[in-house]
Regions:
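Non-catalytic surface loops within mature trypsin-like serine protease
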Residues: 35, 169, 181, 271, ...
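Short flexible/disordered coil segments
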Residues: 49-54, 181-182, 332-340
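TOPRIM fold recognition
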Residues: 7-12, 20, 30, 218-222, ...
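N-terminal, helix-rich and Lys/Arg-enriched segments in bacterial and organellar proteins
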Residues: 110-123, 127, 167, 300, ...
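Non-catalytic accessory segments of DNA primases and related replication-initiation nucleases
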Residues: 1-157, 162, 184-198, 250, ...
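Residue-level marker of positions within ordered structural domains that often coincide
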Residues: 16, 36, 106-107, 170, ...
Length: 357
């Protein structure tokens, strides 16, 4: 049973008097603002986070999803980068995958620079695993995507026909891999998946933010959803575009943006935030969470007829509109009010009615 916070008893995690709840015994907090390892999406599409009070022995309720399992098994970033980069050096890019990347707007030079590779066949994977383990001297089961299969052999995850998209950190290292499957449709599974060993008892890739290769200043940068989308937009626009793994995965940006010394962040999320409540709420929560770590948060929008994503509108060389200050918050508030039954983040209402800073 959950009890709503109030002005007389605010949330012990974020300190606010609304939107959050506590368990009846006060030991577990359901905070709508401050991320934790355990999260869930409620019926309205809002993500909330579970926190234990102090050293409470009360277990986290079983229905909550662990946000970042596998931490204890995951190798340090420098080891993961060593393995993934060695793996990618051993792979090639098939012509059909090269054609797909060209169709998206990337030049041959950019395709080579960014390092996309076709995923190996199941027969090749065993040989690659043996080669990497013998050459690098690394326990590959600590690397997301590698696992011991039912035949007691090292194996590498991924579908039968896909290509790998490097997820890079601020040093340009490959710290994770996203796979784009060739097949689509309900029977084929998701189009994009991250390489993970979680279902085999190994590590997941964890919270991720992709930083596309870019040589210029990043004091002003954009953020969107999707690695390949960010790569294409960075290449075509000539400006840095960071990538969240989904519309609500802002956790990594909270620490990354200050490290990069980003002053102005422009949210350039998919055009369907106008019609998809989950995308809209993710966008609103991202803006609210990140406004405290940068000087300014702005929003970039465009005519949906030009394309869904920032990469589409960049390829089309279409017009984009920048919403700044109070105008940006009012845009989000107005869209939230248009969804029946959607619970708007209280902080958003405050920002839209203030000067927007």
């Amino acid at each position: 049973m959950w009890v709503r916070v109030s002005r007389s008893f605010p949330c012990p995690v974020c300190g606010r008097p609304d939107w959050c709840s506590l368990s009846e015994d006060g030991e577990v907090v359901k905070c709508m603002r401050v991320p934790s390892d355990f999260s869930k999406v409620d019926a309205s599409g809002s993500t909330y986070y579970i926190h234990r009070q102090g050293d409470s022995p009360v277990p986290i309720p079983g229905e909550f999803r662990r946000s970042d399992r596998g931490d204890e098994r995951r190798a340090p970033v420098e080891v993961r980068a060593k393995v993934y980069e060695a793996l990618f050096r051993r792979l090639r890019l098939r012509q059909d995958h090269r054609d797909d990347l060209r169709r998206r707007g990337l030049s041959e030079e950019e395709i080579g620079r960014r390092g996309y590779k076709s995923w190996p066949s199941f027969q090749e994977r065993r040989r690659l695993c043996e080669d990497l383990a013998g050459t690098l001297g690394v326990d590959l089961t600590t690397i997301p995507g590698f696992f011991v299969n039912r035949f007691d052999s090292l194996s590498l995850g991924g579908g039968p026909s896909c290509y790998g998209i490097p997820c890079r950190d601020k040093e340009g290292r490959i710290i994770a891999v996203q796979l784009r499957n060739d097949d689509s449709g309900p029977e084929a599974g998701p189009k994009y998946i991250f390489l993970s060993s979680l279902r085999h008892g190994g590590p997941s890739p964890g919270y991720l933010t992709h930083i596309p290769l870019y040589d210029g200043d990043v004091a002003e940068c954009r953020v969107t959803e999707g690695l390949l989308k960010a790569d294409v937009a960075t290449s075509l626009l000539g400006t840095p575009v960071l990538a969240m793994t989904n519309c609500s995965s802002f956790q990594g940006l909270r620490t990354l943006l200050p490290e990069l010394k980003v002053r102005r962040l422009i949210l350039a999320m998919d055009a369907d935030h106008r019609t998809n409540r989950h995308v809209l709420l993710g966008m609103a929560n991202t803006a609210l969470q990140l406004r405290v770590v940068v000087e300014e948060v702005a929003i970039e929008v465009w005519d949906p007829a030009l394309g869904k994503g920032l990469d589409d509108v960049a390829k089309a060389e279409g017009a984009r509109q920048l919403l700044e200050g109070r105008e940006a918050w009012q845009w989000l508030r107005r869209l939230c009010l248009g969804f029946r039954g959607l619970i708007m983040p209280p902080d958003l209402n405050e920002m839209a009615l203030s000067d927007g800073k």
